[in-house]
Amino acid sequence: MTERSVGYVETKHHHLKEPFRLVSGDELAEVSIAYETYGKLNSDKSNVILICHALTGDAHAAGWHEGDKKPGWWDIVIGPGKAFDTNKYFIICSNVLGGCKGTTGPSSTNPQSGLPYGLSFPRITIEDMVNLQHTLLNNLGISRLYAIAGGSMGGMQVLQWAVSYPGFMKRSIVLASTAISSPQQIAFNEVARQAIIRDPYWNDGDYYGVELPKQGLSLARMIGHITYLSDDSMHDKFGRDIRENEMFQVESYLHHQGDTFTSRFDPNSYLYLTGAIDKFDLSNGYSLAKTFSNIESEFMVISVSSDWLYPSYQSEEIVQALGSNDVDVQYRKLISHFGHDAFLLEKGQLNYLLSTFLGHLTVGDVMSEDVSTLHEGCTLEEAAQLMILKNATHIPILATSGRITGIVTSWDITRAVANKISSIENILSRDILTSRPDESLSSAALVMEDHAISALPVVDDRGCLVGILSSDTISAMVGKGTK
């Protein structure tokens, strides 16, 4: 366990006192919701962030349970100092309706029969999942979210939240998702469902207490994992390597993923949840733009360059529909070879993008305070020597008061030598752009991008230099982009 972990956590359970009504009109007499929380709720309950999980996820998004071999599924972005900073935010993640990790689903006991629901469990939708989350938050006394975030099926929930409860959240984050399930996505899910249904132990979904349709569920998971990866990631991860048992490494990987999955997931839940994904269509037969006409929250939509399960064009459709309604929306693309799974793996890029959107990462948080400077009246030779000594490309020039009066770059030095310019006063830039320590990092980064500059001096209220923000610093935060 690292210092930036939320530590050991426990899953909590909330039991509804009233029946829960579904979009279909059906009711569930008894509903239990599994959820986890991280961080501390502030006095006015204004720091709450809801995390929505993907198809086979659960409420355990961060930290450790006793006996865990690895932390929660989104631990890379949840914890002290991470994007979802538990020193600042109160994070909630609940298992979805229809799941099998503590929230009522097909494997739960039907109070009328005393037996597992199986296929008698009513059909559910993404909207039902969101309505249950809304009920949980209301029962916890939370009437407003600072933000909501989710990837894949979790992203669908975020979109549904923004449509169903437009004034409930301030910021919405959708990763590697879609507003309308495509025929290809439906096709993969149908093949996975058929693998389960055609298992000899399927027994029309009434397999509880006897033999589970493990082979079918394992095959369904193998199909899923193929779609979560990319061609590049398979080449990098497996190549054509052969294991000792004469299986290709990729075959061994898929068998392992399938076999281990059967011990932690219910086949019926897989059917119900993929069915809800397939039915998801926020256009409602009209257009996304019309559906998004009442949205009030700011949006960040993130796609993955190598995701062929939820391709970038689907994220771009969301962005276009939001933009047509003048919604404040930012669109970013993870440059990654990991495929769909990149939203769970790209630690550097995710923490940078999410932190800047949530608005708590400032220039002062990341700027370098160890800045090499020179004073007015210095010579070209002094500037060149300092650049070589400090391996610097930008040298701020200061007045005796500490105020920045100009900046000289390695390009300026090169130009001076080529043109036989002897005075530094004739080459330094005086019309310089600066930043402040409290400026958001995203704002400063945009200034650097728009003006094609690689460093931005940071000054205080008096104009005195206090640090410098470089493109190298930002790149180091993001981490090396994968192909």
From Swiss-Prot:
The gene is metXA. Its EC number is 2.3.1.31. Pfam families: Abhydrolase_1 (PF00561), CBS (PF00571). The active site is at S152 (nucleophile), D307, H340. This is Homoserine O-acetyltransferase. Coiled coil: none annotated. It comes from the Archaea. Homodimer. Belongs to the AB hydrolase superfamily. MetX family. Keywords: Acyltransferase, Amino-acid biosynthesis, CBS domain, Cytoplasm, Methionine biosynthesis, Repeat, Transferase. InterPro entries: AB_hydrolase_1, AB_hydrolase_fold, CBS_dom, CBS_dom_sf, HAT_MetX-like. Transfers an acetyl group from acetyl-CoA to L-homoserine, forming acetyl-L-homoserine. Substrate binds at R221, D341. Residues 367-423, 428-483 form the CBS domain. GO terms for cellular component: cytoplasm. GO terms for molecular function: homoserine O-acetyltransferase activity. Pathway: Amino-acid biosynthesis; L-methionine biosynthesis via de novo pathway; O-acetyl-L-homoserine from L-homoserine: step 1/1. SMART domains: CBS. It catalyses: L-homoserine + acetyl-CoA = O-acetyl-L-homoserine + CoA. Residues 47-346 form the AB hydrolase-1 domain. It is found in: Cytoplasm. GO terms for biological process: homoserine metabolic process; methionine biosynthetic process.
